[in-house]
């Protein structure tokens, strides 16, 4: 392997590294969304088992307001494409669980892709190492 080929392989290695980092970043974002959905499920389960109607409502910027719920048996759920529908709590929990399942599948696909990229990176690293030996042997 000559110096130009090694440089090409190094460039490829760098591009793969960037791709892997981007993929792992996307997987991390998905994990945060899953955590948010799981917290929502916990809150819905709590609402379903309590008759207490006083809550702290987030208004943004880590600021909360005291509020009272009129109906703890139903919630408004985003079912996709900006469409919101009133659903009983159990149905809302089912929707969130399906979304979590879909997100986990996406996350698994991303991680599999990242592992494939990592394997390619290891192969390139091996080729470069072998190439470096050949180049350094020629210099001696």
Language model: regions and residue ranges:
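Intrinsically disordered, low-complexity regulatory regions in eukaryotic proteins
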Residues: 1-79, 83-140
